[in-house]
Amino acid sequence: MTPLTRRDVLAHQAHVPWPKLRQVEQDLLLCRSMCALFNDKFLHGQIAMRGGTLLHKVHLAPPARYSEDIDLVVFGNRPEEHIRLAIERVLADVLGRPTQSLWDWVLMALRNASKPSRLLRITYTLQPVSLPGPPLNIKIEANVTERTPHRAIQEIPFAFPFQGKSIETRLNGYDLHEMLGTKLRALFQREAGRDLFDLFWALTKSSPPADPAAIIESFLFYVRQEGGVAGRAEFVDLLQVRLKNRGFCADMEQLLRAGIVYDPQEAGRYVQAHLLNLLPR
């Protein structure tokens, strides 16, 4: 394992908007991990990235909110255990040995979905070098069930400065609209206010503008894949329940970039008007 130094973290602080050194250090670990994963020839032909880290660090850069994990999807045809071993091999030099590596079955979307997804969940625990404090946790999650994406996977350049060099890769990433479709799915799967923020931010800030109809198309693709059924009214009602949940509305308080003012109630109204109202009845 090649450990970070405090000097590395302080240098990275000039390139990211996070106020806490712990966040800066974790961001640097994520950057190194992303490049390590996609610079590996085997994994580059097997995995793609989606989720909040890709959305904010790549599609909507500079990032508006902090993200702390890496979400992957396996699109290649190699056995799932080969994928697990390759991820652990590649990340050993960046993150060391995982503290947890397990397989799980998860219902990814609606509560009445009938087809769960198989997920690989790997957790790394590292002592921070920037400041004394509790350990940092880096989580890598890989979905090995959803191997056929709705839209073509994109090869996207990604780079960051490290120790006087530019560390570069070309990562496989989900199309913005498909990723927002999975974000809409996540909004109804879990009580995390960041999913609402991500949809609102992408709909209002993406350049070129995101197409709400394309987002809905991808969302419905995954609903059908999982055997889920629900109408527009059910989604609207569930969003209203979310917006009455104090924890859901407070989720973004420690994650936003300085200077961003965010009102989850306003975001909820916008997402309902511009996205949910496009759902079939």
PLM feature spans:
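Glycine-rich beta-strand-to-loop/alpha-helix junction loops that act as flexible
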Residues: 49-54
